[in-house]
């Protein structure tokens, strides 16, 4: 959700900014802009639309060694060039890019900026005018003006500030919004995440909330808001350029769907030794053993992954599990058990809603585990423990491999705790073998892409509405499948417990309504779900079945290899990912960048 990139030093700033913004496209945006400066000139260029639209406006004379760039996802004000970043102060001297939400921007505007002229309607423009006022009207130094502004501003922010009269410095600050420093020889960078800087550096420095950074080409100075200098160690990122390219794929989403067998095998090599023994941090196991209830907090796809693992976690750990929507728990935390433990699922590790819950958990002394794809992310730093899902960069906005990797990672956790408790079911659960079979099942499904595309064309070519139904874990997969179809095909789709159809939803079924039924786990589940299929078919529904091998009948549409019931959500979700992909593709939509959506939701 928005992206920042900046560079100061001995590099071509325009090229670096544009390449960086392209790497940040996956975060979601509706406009973009750059500010580039050298000793002789400055250039501010903004555009509504894609990065390609911005690139088309940049002339060959736009050059410099220092600059800041931004992709904007509208929160205050519509998507216009005036509202696009970077924003300038009243005189144009100061230039600012910002991710986050300034909560008291109206108070700042009326209290400090009477008589100022504003070009747009953003909270960011208020912030840069405030900085400019303190320098040009109140005669503070740039650094003191920045600090004073930060003491007034309330909310979440990641700021990168430049002074057009001293273009050899970038001022940076953050609070509740992700930001990284990239380190180079003769240049330094700032960015929302490492993805945008990986072509230029693999050395990074984390900055924490309410810290201020001064970047020059040769030095990075980190202080708190009182000016006390802080020592920050750097680290080397494990990203590879080949991981963030599409290769021969038309869309990242298809590439990431295809990578899931590899991800399963990577998790095996990470969380099991050569003899198949599960290896999970003993401190995490002990913490779960000491808890009397586990609370899984997440949003979107990660929330659905939590549901898909609930039954497995309870059966193998003998600990009750509750699911919570992070955005709701941030405002109203329900009555908790006496010894709770929180598990936060987040692909990016930056989800603002989940972080809000984590801050409360930390204040209450509740132990927490973050399960994430991004080492060094905010949630991984602030939680008590972290498990990485090792899915590799996920660029497409619609999550696929992170969902299946979260389920697999939690399977290792559940088995490890169960074994530590001496639970026979956990001891008998040969996870390495079973997950290897899951990888094979995924590969078998992926070999049937043409069949799925054909089924989608017949089922979803013109529809505006669709339904997924299932029972047990299939219901949880149905919720994720419906979200995926909504996200990238814009088909209104809902996932329902099949047994709930007769309690209201069946009134929506009419001639040719698409209903996709998921069937796995047991003959009992299959029998009852097929009864529901007959109910909707009798009302004219166009039914497509996704059925686990051994439960299939003649006439079923997509057959999925049988896997262990705990891991069935992984195998069963793969056809639904392909269904969403082909539905979007056949409608001529941008599969990787659906409208109005962001990959990492970093504001509440």
Curated annotation (Swiss-Prot):
It is found in: Cytoplasm. One of its GO terms (molecular function) is carbohydrate derivative binding. InterPro entries: GATase_2_dom (IPR017932), GFAT (IPR005855), GFAT_N (IPR047084), GlmS/AgaS_SIS (IPR035466), GlmS/FrlB_SIS (IPR035490), Ntn_hydrolases_N (IPR029055), SIS_dom (IPR001347), SIS_dom_sf (IPR046348). Homodimer. Coiled coil: none annotated. Keywords: Aminotransferase, Cytoplasm, Glutamine amidotransferase, Repeat, Transferase. GO terms for cellular component: cytosol. Pfam families: GATase_6 (PF13522), SIS (PF01380). Its EC number is 2.6.1.16. Catalyzes the first step in hexosamine metabolism, converting fructose-6P into glucosamine-6P using glutamine as a nitrogen source. It catalyses: D-fructose 6-phosphate + L-glutamine = D-glucosamine 6-phosphate + L-glutamate. Residues 2-218 form the Glutamine amidotransferase type-2 domain. This is Glutamine--fructose-6-phosphate aminotransferase [isomerizing]. The active site is at 2 (nucleophile), 599 (for fru-6p isomerization activity). NCBIfam families: glmS, PRK00331.1. Residues 284-423, 456-594 form the SIS domain. It comes from Streptococcus pyogenes serotype M1. GO terms for biological process: carbohydrate metabolic process; fructose 6-phosphate metabolic process; protein N-linked glycosylation; UDP-N-acetylglucosamine metabolic process. PANTHER family: GLUCOSAMINE--FRUCTOSE-6-PHOSPHATE AMINOTRANSFERASE, ISOMERIZING (PTHR10937), GLUTAMINE--FRUCTOSE-6-PHOSPHATE TRANSAMINASE (ISOMERIZING) (PTHR10937:SF0).
